[in-house]
Structures are given as C-alpha cells and as structure tokens.
Amino acid sequence: GLGVSFPSIVSQHGETLHNLNSDGVLENGRLLLVDAGAESLENYCSDHTRTYPVSGKFTQKQKDIYEIVLRAHDEAPKNMKTGAMYMEEVHKKALLSLAEGLHDVGLIKGAPQDAVEAGAMYLFMPHGLSHGLGMDVHDCEAMGERSYDFSEMKERAIASGTCVYRAAWRLHEGTVMSNEPGIYFIPALIDKCRAEGLYKGIVNYAKLDEYRDFGGIRIEDDVLVTETGSRFIGDKLLPLTVEELEAVVGSLK
C-alpha cells in the first residue's frame, strides 16, 4: 500500500476521541484502543478499530461493555442498505442497540428508546456511527446537506442534544462507510451533564460513578452497501470476539 490512511490512534484513554498521545506505559487492567488504517495503491482508505485488554483478559465489567458494543457492530450492517437514510435508519438504530445493553447492566433506567429520543446516548457515544470512506478517510462529509431541509428536525435536535450531522445522507449501492459503535465513560462529560441536570430519570448517575476510570471501547470495520444489502469489506475480519482478542494479547506475552 501507500502507508497509513491517517495518524494511528493507540491509547489506553479510549474515552478521549482522536487521542494521538501514545507514549504511556501499558498497565494491566487497562484497555488499549487501536484505531488505524491503510491506504491502497489506488489511494483508497481503510479505517479499523479494536480494543484490547492489556492484561490479556477482560474483566467482567469490561467484557459486559464490550459485548454490548459488539452486538451493535454486528447488527448495524443489516440497516445499511440502498435507499436508507443514515440518521434515522442506521445511526439511531445503533444507539438503540447500545441503550438496550446499557439498560441491561443498570446504567440506563426506563425504556431504552426514551434514552435515544432524549439524546442521553450522547453521554456514552458522542460521535456518529459512520462516516464515508474513499480517497479521504472521512469522505464526502456534507453529502446532500446543501439541499436538505433541517427545519423540521432543528427544534427537536436542540432540545434533545441529538446531532443532525449527516442527517441528509442517503445510502446508495456502492457507498463505502465505516461501522464504529462505541461506549465511552468521559469523566468531564459525565460531570457536566450531571451538574446541568440532564437526563434525570434516564441515566443512572450513581451506577455510572463505578465506571469513571473505565476508559472507552470502540469496534470499527468498513462496510460496502450493495444492491441487496451490505457486507463487511475484506475476506476476513480482524480478531473480533472477546476470545479472539484475548488470544491475540496472550500470544504476545
């Protein structure tokens, strides 16, 4: 290939998005997030993320959160199909999957759908599920937005904290996009939302205190939208399951 498609992110602070500081010493019990990609000879970019247990074994708490993210990662391509509107049919469905998992571990109270509609998932995943991929690793970011009428969504978006970015994105056959759900525990963001009284009755802030030093987990692969649905790009995915990731780290010790 032609080298990396962007500066690699290798960090034990996965809760800090796009963290390029990778000079820390690995510590047992921490999670190591690796977000990297390569550029092909034809100048097309890839983008992948895996999160590894530094010790070689996930703790039960880490495993629980990882499995929630993995389920969202595996389910998302089912919604990535020709004609789908990204925000409503892809991004929000992934948020709902994450919310259901967070509800199961006690971090969200009430109906998971209410957490999505209230914008509470912003606290756990403050970024989009996907971005376009092409000759730029974030390709064609404003696709369709010049002619899109945001007026109907604006008031609701402001009230809920829901991002309208990429809301005009309609998927087509041949679209290449990332699939990167994540769950992050960002102390400053938790404190801010709590102090402002946001998401009361939805987020279990008392339980959330147990995760302040957790870090973050993201899983990312690249997807091609086809005539009949979508598929992951590549003959074989990088190690993905809890068992596979533990085996990778174990082989290095």
Predicted features along the sequence, with ranges:
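Active-site neighborhoods and metal-handling regions in enzymes and metal-associated proteins
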Residues: G1-K253
